[in-house]
């Protein structure tokens, strides 16, 4: 049985804003504390995989060194791109373009920010990355340091959920879910 623990990065510097694959802030001091606390009780991983973005990669590199584990960075597992909204605060967008902001929250599949990555394309690349981890580590226990969007896509994969429900899920900074590939397919484990 293959297991992947998906760990969302900790709080980044710069506050709450649209931070996709175009804004690469490092972790804040609090973000580092969140990450170390999240992994304090677990060390049975056989491999670490990370998004190449700093808020994931820098912690993954340090943890892999500390645990003497192999590390891979996979660009398929970077955050979804938010186009023109990258780096902007929610309030700023809501005030500047309330119609687009509301349309996005009502139907994020068909009302993407200008220049944003299409949600179906994002899901396809994350799905490919997750399945590759399962294929490359058929008996392994992999830690994947990633983003909220990647966790949403992984949840949608496991539960065969429509992309229209994508933004109804939330995982806090340094929050974690687990996927297992079994005879039944990919299973989602919460609160392991």
Give residue ranges: language-model regions.
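Acidic, low-complexity terminal tails and accessory targeting/binding regions
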Residues: 1-3, 38, 80-92, 135, ...
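Active-site-proximal alpha-helix that buttresses catalytic centers in soluble enzyme cores
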Residues: 4-69
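Short, active-site-adjacent cap segments at secondary-structure transitions
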Residues: 13, 55-57, 79-81, 150-152
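Generic structural signal for well-ordered alpha-helical scaffold segments
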Residues: 36-40, 123, 127-135
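Active-site signature of alpha/beta-hydrolase-fold catalytic machinery across serine-
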Residues: 62, 153-157
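Phosphate-handling substructures
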Residues: 66-125, 187-190
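Short basic (Lys/Arg) and small-residue
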Residues: 147
């Amino acid at each position: 049985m293959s297991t992947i623990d998906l760990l969302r990065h900790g709080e980044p510097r710069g506050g709450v804003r649209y931070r996709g694959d175009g804004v690469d802030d490092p972790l804040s001091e609090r973000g580092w504390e969140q990450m170390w606390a999240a992994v304090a009780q677990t060390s049975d991983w056989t491999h670490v995989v990370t998004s190449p973005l700093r808020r994931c990669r820098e912690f993954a590199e340090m943890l892999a060194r500390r645990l003497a584990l192999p590390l891979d960075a996979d660009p398929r597992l970077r955050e979804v791109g938010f186009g023109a909204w990258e780096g902007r605060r929610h309030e700023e967008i809501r005030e500047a373009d309330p119609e687009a902001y509301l349309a996005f929250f009502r139907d994020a599949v068909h009302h993407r920010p200008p220049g944003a990555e299409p949600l179906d394309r994002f899901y396809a690349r994350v799905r490919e990355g997750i399945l590759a981890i399962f294929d490359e580590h058929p008996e392994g226990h992999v830690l994947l340091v990633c983003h909220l969007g990647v966790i949403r896509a992984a949840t949608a994969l496991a539960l065969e959920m429509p992309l229209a429900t994508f933004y109804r899920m939330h995982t806090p900074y340094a929050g974690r879910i687990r996927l297992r590939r079994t005879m039944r397919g990919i299973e989602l484990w919460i609160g392991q």
